[in-house]
């Protein structure tokens, strides 16, 4: 079945994409002062959806990190808006990965509008478990959460006070959260914010809310707040085995099974009576019913009918670009694909593949330690070097003047050369000197990735020497003095312990510069740092684990335990807007797999490129080069390994 989408005015599509990164960044920052934040975050979510709808015209599958980040950010904004409707509210934050910014809330908005405290709510407050939203608090994680036990903060779930019953906001937030694979993190919010069934009988939108709560979260409101009757009252036929071994009540304690979910959906639908289906909630209920029953053919028939009805409604007015993405149908198809493994039998631009599959990535060319090499990738290596292109950096397009970076470097080095400068101040500023030279290096690389640029090379030398000097001081005993050489000048500087001591992230930057430079003494200052420097505590990070593995590899001890740990942490972590370190690439060096290194290198460079397609990230100087990757490549070349990858990310003038 093929269902074409309705058309959107070209001017609206262009406007939705034009300068989007700058516009949405401004909108998110203005949310810090928005007096009506729930409405503001809904508008932010709509802007992301307009952008995605417009992009889907050029990119029908909506693949890529930019679309993934935009969808996740739309979900974050929509869920945040929903949580802001709860009274009283817990402390929480809305963070927009696409922009790298957000707002924290502590329940300070509209407190004067709260009704008087009721029994069990001293001063209008609500007891909070203290757990982050989405953490296990009475229900299990995963697809079948089991029933939430009906209490949250001392009240029946679903009966907390709300300033409004914004059912459309609830539905949009749930659909977006599911598509972005974050619904389970906000389970408590959805259950608390759901409009109650009692008093809303006959409303198809509320019926859809409760049907989705049953199917997605395994939750039903409970005998006092859910359906005003029993299945028999609606002429429904219950399977004989539905009540085997349990009381004669489908609302008894325990998880809501699929057969019960079907019964619940039938019951809410039976209360609706006759009526039209604007804006399509009845059709969505019908599609959801087939999904719950496991009726694949019926599901796709109803989904096709749902989309045809949707198109007819959309064609009747001046629709916004976001109308190209019907969230209800998309979420239902995503549930069918991700939970039941059903392929999409309805061909339509309304159902971009990446949104349905959850942005399933392509299989990597190689996995850790040279495992599972893709046959096509290995075959490609036998023909020509792999090529990874790099977009022209905005600095080059704008012909950015790099002289301010050079002037800053000259001023810093003048101070370092001056014997009258305070040695303690110079010692404390070594890491700042490294950071400034690193930025200068990246700017120069962005402007001319392949050229022979003496200023770029000078920045590399000065940055690597400054980082190594800071680490040499960090190793020394407090109260002693150490010779540090930067730019041909040696100064005797005092060692100390305190807030200016380098951290593992700065070590990572310093060792990358040292590996690119290839000076043995400079690298030694990085490698000789004590292993305890990388202690992670109770919250290991991908970056810290990578540093520990790289440190073990470079200092010649068995690196596999630390490498295994880094791979484990990297696989578990949600890096959000941060680019993960090249752990798989490092594992090829640990394994000694030359072919695997080349394959992993191509993957790492493509991952870097894709990361910087999101929003305004491409304007960042870090987009020009991945110094972690470049450092490992230079190290491999010095080991004599052939690296059959050609890319502007690997400037020939820097490779050994």
Feature names for model-found ranges:
Residues 1-53, 276-292, 300-447, 575-586, ...:
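Terminal, non-catalytic domain-edge segments
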């Amino acid at each position: 079945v093929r269902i074409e989408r309705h058309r959107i005015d070209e001017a609206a599509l262009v406007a939705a994409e034009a300068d989007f990164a700058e516009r949405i960044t401004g909108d998110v920052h203005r949310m810090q002062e928005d007096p009506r934040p729930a409405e503001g975050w809904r508008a932010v979510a709509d802007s992301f959806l307009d952008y995605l709808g417009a992009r889907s015209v050029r990119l029908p599958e909506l693949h890529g990190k930019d679309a993934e980040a935009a969808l996740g950010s739309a979900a974050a904004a929509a869920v945040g808006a929903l949580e802001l409707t709860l009274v009283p509210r817990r402390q929480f934050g809305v963070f927009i990965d696409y922009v790298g910014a957000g707002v924290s809330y502590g329940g300070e908005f509209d407190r004067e509008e709260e009704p008087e405290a009721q029994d069990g709510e001293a001063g209008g407050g609500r007891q909070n478990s203290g757990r982050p939203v989405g953490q296990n608090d009475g229900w299990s994680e995963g697809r079948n959460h089991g029933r939430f036990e009906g209490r949250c903060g001392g009240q029946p779930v679903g009966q907390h006070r709300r300033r409004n019953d914004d059912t459309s906001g609830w539905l949009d937030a749930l659909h977006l959260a599911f598509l972005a694979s974050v619904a389970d993190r906000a389970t408590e919010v959805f259950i608390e914010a759901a409009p109650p069934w009692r008093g809303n009988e006959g409303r198809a939108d509320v019926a859809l809310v409760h049907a989705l709560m049953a199917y997605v979260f395994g939750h039903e409101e409970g005998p006092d707040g859910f359906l005003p009757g029993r299945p028999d009252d609606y002429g429904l036929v219950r399977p004989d085995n539905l009540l085997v071994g349990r009381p004669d009540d489908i609302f008894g304690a325990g998880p809501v099974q699929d057969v019960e979910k079907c019964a619940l959906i039938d019951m809410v639908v039976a209360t609706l009576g006759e009526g039209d289906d604007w804006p399509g909630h009845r059709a969505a209920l019908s599609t959801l019913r087939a999904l719950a029953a496991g009726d694949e053919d019926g599901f796709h028939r109803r989904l096709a009918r749902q989309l045809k009805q949707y198109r007819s409604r959309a064609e009747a007015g001046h629709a916004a670009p976001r109308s190209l993405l019907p969230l209800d149908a998309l979420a239902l198809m995503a549930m069918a694909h991700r939970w039941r493994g059903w392929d999409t039998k309805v061909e339509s631009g309304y159902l971009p593949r990446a949104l349905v599959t959850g942005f399933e990535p392509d299989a990597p060319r190689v996995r850790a330690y040279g495992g599972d090499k893709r046959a096509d990738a290995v075959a490609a290596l036998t023909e020509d070097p792999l090529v990874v292109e790099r977009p022209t950096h905005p600095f080059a397009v704008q012909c950015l003047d790099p002289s301010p970076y050079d002037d800053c470097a000259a001023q810093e080095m003048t101070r370092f050369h001056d014997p009258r400068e305070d040695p303690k101040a110079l010692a404390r500023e070594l890491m700042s000197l490294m950071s400034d030279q690193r930025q200068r290096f990246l700017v120069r690389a962005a402007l001319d990735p392949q050229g022979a640029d003496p200023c770029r090379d000078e920045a590399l030398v000065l940055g690597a020497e400054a980082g190594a000097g800071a680490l040499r001081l960090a190793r020394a005993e407090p109260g002693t003095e150490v010779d540090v050489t930067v730019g041909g000048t040696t100064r005797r500087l005092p060692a100390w312990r305190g807030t200016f001591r380098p951290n593992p992230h700065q070590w990572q930057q310093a060792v990358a510069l040292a590996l690119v430079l290839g000076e043995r003494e400079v690298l030694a200052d990085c490698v000789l740092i004590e292993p305890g420097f990388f202690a992670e505590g109770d919250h290991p990070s991908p970056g810290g684990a990578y540093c520990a593995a790289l440190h073990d590899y470079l200092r010649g001890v068995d690196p596999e335990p630390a490498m295994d740990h880094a791979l484990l942490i990297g696989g578990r972590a949600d890096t959000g807007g941060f680019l993960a370190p090249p752990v798989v690439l490092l594992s090829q060096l640990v394994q000694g797999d030359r072919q695997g290194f080349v394959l992993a290198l191509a993957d790492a460079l493509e991952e870097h490129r894709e990361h910087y397609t999101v929003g305004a990230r491409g304007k960042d100087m870090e987009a020009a080069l991945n110094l972690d990757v470049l450092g490992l490549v230079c190290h491999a070349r010095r080991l004599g390994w052939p690296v059959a990858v050609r890319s502007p990310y690997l400037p020939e003038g820097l490779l050994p």
